[in-house]
Amino acid sequence: MSRIATSPAVLRQLLSASLRVTPAGSVEILDAAQLRQSGAATIAWTAAFSTDEATVAAAQWLARATAVAAGIQSASIAPLYAARANGAYEWLTVPALNLRSQVFEMSRTALETAAAMDGAALIFELARSEQTYTFQRPADYATSVLCGAIAAGWRGPVFIQGDHYQFVAKKYATDPEGVAAEIARACRLAVDAGYRNIDIDASTLVDLALPTVQEQQRVNAVRTAEAVALVRELEPAGLEISMGGEIGEVGHQNSTAEELAAYLDEFDVALASRSAGARGLRKVSVQTGTSHGGVPLPGGGVAEVALDFTVLKELGELARARGLAGAVQHGASTLPEDLFHRFPEVG
């Protein structure tokens, strides 16, 4: 039976049949079946619901250490994206799941389903805005996902992502450096929590009133490059955190090839000036007709989406020609099931 521990000592006692902490500070799994059945939930629920900070910290540490003992790694998806960019894979699409509640249960179910269909390329992500209203810091979210992986009996990489680390345009207009500092802090917290994938969204800063596409995308590219350069300083030695950018604010007009090319050109210049030789982006999110949450209708339904797969295909090909894995379709959660097969078709 899963329980919420009231202290680190009680947590160790509740888990004593499932695992032990060795004198060297690692975790040894004693009963894998019991760990999956109840131990992982005890760690997850204690981390989420305990009111004692030391107990929460102990549960978060146990989640990371137990995951390692179980053969689970919070991993960067950059190697897979690099292989896609090099043409090693076709017909590949990577769904990203924004789990806002019941994260332990939902990540477990998602990974059990993936294992049953011999799948592994899926991302668990949470946006900065979602962190706020769901009261989940990166460390909280990573703990729940890793515990879900343990409960699922998963082995191998788990991709956890900071989604939409977004520059809020209204705040940026009056305090640009303050907003940039917020994004930098978010990146630091994500890396510290074990996130190995982060998406920066400065597309809100695009100014379509400027005369050229390069000028329109410049602030977007520069602020994204600043964040990428910071993450390159923070990432562990020998590991590349997968970084994403964005050119089309979701829910607004469709992106174009000219915009993507201008953004990547401006980004490359900005990154080189801050961190010469640093690895840049692995993907770029674009807008092709969706909006987050869909467009609600008066009767309670959701309007059909006029999704432009031609645009997605064109931008994906351009992105791969520039060494990226492709283009990312945001706001797909409300799309009808009969459209999802199109994503690997168009790349």
Residue ranges and their predicted role:
Residues 1-179, 186, 195:
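Alpha/beta catalytic barrel-like cores
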Residues 52, 103, 134-137, 212, ...:
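Helix N-cap and loop-to-helix transition residues
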Residues 1-46, 59-75, 183-184, 191, ...:
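Active-site capping/gating regions of soluble enzymes
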